[in-house]
Amino acid sequence: MKHTIYIAGPMRGKENNNETAFHNAEKRLNRRGFTVINPLNIGRSIASDEIIAGNADLLKTVMKIERMLIRHCDAIYLLEGWKESDGVKAELVTAIGFDCMIFLESEDIEARQEKEHKNGRTPWDHDGAETPGAGVHS
């Protein structure tokens, strides 16, 4: 079963809106078999200059669209620097609310999947024993 993962990371204040990190993450996740939702591919880049310039109404609209996309994902993938981004924090809260798995860019997803598989689980098994996003706060 192919799982859908949403990439979340800081954009404002980053060189080229952090495009390189988003696209590298997309390639890496595609190679691991995920269906990837990269917000840069969904029109956010079209409006990014206005968002960076401070168009609050447009930013709110984009965030609503992103929250709707996260609802349809199994996981969220947090790029480095996510803790400094209020937008990413909001996306994370949304993902936790929809019981998405949380992966960090610094995390070895394959190793995590193998470890959980050996324990008779997958990262997608939720039995209420673990809190989604546990360990994200480190």
Residue ranges and their predicted role:
Residues M1-S138:
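Conserved catalytic or regulatory cores that recognize and/or transform ribose-phosphate-containing ligands
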